[in-house]
């Protein structure tokens, strides 16, 4: 990575800031950039800076389906054009079907008056472009930096850093991931469940072109998604019980290609090539609250959801937009941006929305796990009915888009 990023050593005592954001992933970097562009003095603390994105490197296995609301936010932050032009795979159609009942539902951008349903983009590309924009926006980057503790006071919060330094701010934003050490330090618990599944991921070449279509098939063991990449391949996310995931990861390449072809119902023809495979565990986790004194949670630190709807990062970016708007309104009204009543608006709105979405995704996962013939038949009837109810289907698509 280019070492001229001028990241500030955390040992230096910085002057008081409006906001300190901890966690430099996609959501944390977007939050720091959004708040800085809104005129708040902002610092971003991260233990490890991202590696430079390389257009000549293999497409990263971790990809995100960016919804239109996320694209709008990234465009407001001045980074979307760079992301799109670098390597973003647009999709205009989505086909979802049930392996057991055969019921299917289709979504089409043109029928909804949109150009695209979304874009499939590498996580590290989004993160890198956000980091590239931080310096010009005036964000102070403390990297490497780790927070060992913090103490909220009447008018500020003081962070104790691992190197012995301190930092003071009006508000601390924790965007430090699902395991969130800061959430634990704040004494905020979580609720949820372990799905006892792993998502197997890889990029594959197929016999037929994907035609800018996202495919998702609900199988007895979990959903399989084929997401269109900019280079013509598809990114797969195959949710499987843990033992089955281990078996699939251990298959030789041809056996894996054959099984994946069957699992995908050969909708794109034979699967002809694959990258090395990886897997990550799946769980549902929701923070019991999103705020503490001069402290808020953001992104995966607040909520982790099943990937079947592809909404995890989109929910985090909606957190960013809501927090920015909340703080801008508070400043315009002459209020303290770290005051409990100010943060309550953000926490109430986002926790309510995130909880409804997370429980909806969880319910969908449970419904498609049904194996009873009667329940499978009922599920099929419901899906076919939804596909015929254009207004309801359009509202579902708009919700997924973030509108």
What residues fall within each predicted segment?
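FAD/FMN-dependent oxidoreductases across multiple families
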Residues: 246-333, 337-338
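Conserved N-terminal helical subregion
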Residues: 14-16, 86-185, 192-198
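Glycine-rich FAD pyrophosphate-binding loop
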Residues: 36-59
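Extreme N-terminal leader/targeting segments of oxidoreductases
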Residues: 1-19, 34-38
């Amino acid at each position: 990575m280019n070492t001229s990023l001028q990241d500030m050593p955390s040992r230096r005592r910085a002057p008081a800031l409006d906001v300190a954001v901890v966690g430099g992933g996609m959501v944390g970097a977007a939050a720091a950039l959004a708040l800085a562009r809104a005129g708040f003095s902002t610092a971003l603390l991260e233990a490890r800076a991202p590696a430079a994105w390389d257009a000549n490197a293999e497409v990263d296995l971790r990809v995100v389906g960016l919804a239109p609301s996320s694209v709008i936010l990234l465009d407001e932050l001045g980074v979307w054009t760079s992301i799109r032009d670098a390597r973003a795979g647009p999709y205009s159609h989505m086909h979802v079907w049930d392996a057991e009942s055969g019921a299917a539902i289709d979504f089409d951008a043109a029928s909804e008056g949109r150009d695209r349903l979304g874009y499939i983009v590498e996580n590290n590309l989004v993160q890198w472009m956000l980091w590239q924009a931080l310096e010009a926006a005036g964000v102070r980057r403390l990297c490497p930096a780790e927070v060992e503790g913090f103490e909220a006071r009447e008018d500020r919060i003081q962070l104790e850093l691992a190197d012995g330094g301190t930092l003071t701010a009006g508000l601390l934003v924790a965007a430090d991931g699902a395991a969130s050490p800061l959430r634990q330090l704040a004494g905020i618990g979580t609720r949820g469940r372990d799905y006892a599944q792993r998502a197997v991921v890889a990029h594959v070449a197929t016999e037929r072109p994907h035609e800018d279509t996202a495919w998702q098939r609900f199988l007895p063991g979990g959903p399989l998604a084929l997401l269109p990449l900019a280079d013509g391949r598809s990114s797969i996310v195959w949710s499987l019980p843990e033992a089955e995931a281990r078996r699939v990861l251990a298959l030789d390449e041809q056996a894996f290609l054959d099984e994946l072809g069957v699992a995908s119902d050969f909708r794109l023809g034979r699967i002809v090539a694959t990258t090395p495979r990886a897997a990550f565990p799946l769980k549902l986790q929701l923070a019991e609250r999103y705020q503490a004194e001069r402290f808020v949670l953001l992104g995966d630190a607040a909520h982790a959801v099943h990937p079947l709807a592809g909404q995890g990062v989109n929910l985090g970016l909606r957190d960013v937009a809501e927090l920015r708007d909340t703080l801008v309104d508070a400043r315009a009204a002459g209020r303290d941006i770290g005051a409990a009543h100010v943060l309550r608006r953000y926490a109430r709105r986002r926790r309510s929305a995130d909880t409804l979405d997370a429980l909806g995704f969880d319910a969908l996962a449970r419904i498609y796990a049904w194996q009873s013939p009667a329940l499978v038949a009922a599920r099929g009837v419901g899906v076919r009915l939804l596909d015929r109810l254009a207004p309801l289907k359009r509202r579902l698509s708009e919700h997924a888009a973030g509108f």
